[in-house]
Amino acid sequence: MKRVLTALAATLPFAANAADAISGAVERQPTNWQAIIMFLIFVVFTLGITYWASKRVRSRSDYYTAGGNITGFQNGLAIAGDYMSAASFLGISALVFTSGYDGLIYSLGFLVGWPIILFLIAERLRNLGRYTFADVASYRLKQGPIRILSACGSLVVVALYLIAQMVGAGKLIELLFGLNYHIAVVLVGVLMMMYVLFGGMLATTWVQIIKAVLLLFGASFMAFMVMKHVGFSFNNLFSEAMAVHPKGVDIMKPGGLVKDPISALSLGLGLMFGTAGLPHILMRFFTVSDAREARKSVFYATGFMGYFYILTFIIGFGAIMLVGANPEYKDAAGHLIGGNNMAAVHLANAVGGNLFLGFISAVAFATILAVVAGLTLAGASAVSHDLFANVFKKGATEREELRVSKITVLILGVIAIILGVLFENQNIAFMVGLAFAIAASCNFPIILLSMYWSKLTTRGTMLGGWLGLITAVVLMILGPTIWVQILGHEKAIFPYEYPALFSISVAFLGIWFFSATDNSAEGARERELFRAQFIRSQTGFGVEQGRAH
């Protein structure tokens, strides 16, 4: 059990980010014209969709939630497209390529947060909210303070995630396309701004759907060709892989990648609860018409992602067999050309030739675009809807709110490009871990307790939420990744790499203690309002649906 927990928990560094899979040194490849042409086709097609979407974005609801008219199936595909990343595809298959069986536990670890979203969050979130999760958190609590806290939690997560994605995008494109790093970062930033600025959630949704379909098709074809090579026998697949892998039979043994059980548990909790607190994922539940469609979204998304992560396992073992044993894909020193993260890309060449290699490379780039578009829209909505329209200028018109949102998109895009260039040679892997830790320590406790705990008050939410956020940031800075590796100190003050176990505990305890000891009249009123909130969260009575949403 300890081994399984350890391996499962260690998935966090690979979770939903392109940067972490390729955060080390990369070796620039020759210009891949097939990949560039296929990617240009994707860009032209998606820009056409953005133009089509821009003609249909007439209101705030259209911009933030595509009018609430996305079906459960479409939204499930879009969620999968938002969550399945280049790290999932390249990083996990590379992990299987080097470590074998552990990669399966890693693949399954990606799904561990989704049952929480399905059973605890999706239905109530849709019934209580309109555009952002702050709508839910502030439903019966004080609007101003809660929205500021929720927006800060969202923006910090989005900023960290976005920087990691931009750096990852630059390195990935350097690997796959042979393009200059700076050109790659600017290209991703400009396309991201165009999708969100003109097409809003409708364009973002269709970019994510198209990317998910392309990625699932590409991975399915690769897995099919691998299985065809071994006569559709898993026994043959594993036997041939063990025969050519340097570790031999040891690649079928689990565990051993994370030694410390406290770190393992902390990572696992960060991944599980962090997924349920990611603002760009939560925002997708407002794009459907009702709670039933929200539940269907999670059901379909989990199915698509589960299928995809099983494919990455087959692809990893296929790479051991068809790439690892082929000197054509090795350099003079005997290492894989471009590094181990190129294992899946080389396999694409091995099973489908140059044309399919170009297709897979283009899909990897499309993967990053889909993720950053969702992040940018989530960040913009936190500023325009939560802060501008509900805190700083109450009663702002829809037109004013949309103008602020689009200005925020431009600012976020420019900042992302600048920081992507500045962080080119920095260790940015910790940013994703910190983003998940903050989502788990600030956003998740607030969402969960606001929907389920009748005694929650504004005072408890504010003090506990800020404590969780600050604890996550401080412990991350004092931990070995930043304190030792980046700042150069000899020994870390906080001994564990990821802080989620401790910061989540601080957040929940803080919210409970300061709410339980809140004897104010305001606190009593907020507790009384829970009954009405509970009825709406269960029945959906009064929820705006579809185009009226």
UniProtKB/Swiss-Prot annotation:
Signal sequence residues: none
Keywords annotated in UniProt: Cell inner membrane, Cell membrane, Ion transport, Membrane, Sodium, Sodium transport, Symport, Transmembrane, Transmembrane helix, Transport
Superkingdom assignment: Bacteria
Pfam families: SSF
Membrane topology type: Multi-pass membrane protein
Transmembrane segments: 33-53, 77-97, 103-123, 148-168, 183-203, 206-226, 262-282, 303-323, 355-375, 404-424, 428-448, 464-484, 493-513
A molecular function (GO) term: acetate transmembrane transporter activity
Gene3D superfamilies (UniProt xref): Sodium/glucose cotransporter
InterPro entries hit by this protein: Cation/Ac_symporter_ActP, Na/Glc_symporter_sf, Na/solute_symporter, Na/solute_symporter_CS, Sodium:Solute_Symporter
Presence of the UniProt keyword Ion transport in the record: yes
Keyword Transport carried by entry: yes
Localization, UniProt: Cell inner membrane
Entry GO CC: plasma membrane
Chief place where the protein resides: membrane
Gene Ontology BP terms: plasma membrane acetate transport; sodium ion transport
Family named by the database record: Belongs to the sodium:solute symporter (SSF) (TC 2.A.21) family.
Function in brief: Transports acetate.
Entry protein name: Cation/acetate symporter ActP
Native source species: Shigella boydii serotype 18 (strain CDC 3083-94 / BS512)
Organism phylogeny: Bacteria, Pseudomonadati, Pseudomonadota, Gammaproteobacteria, Enterobacterales
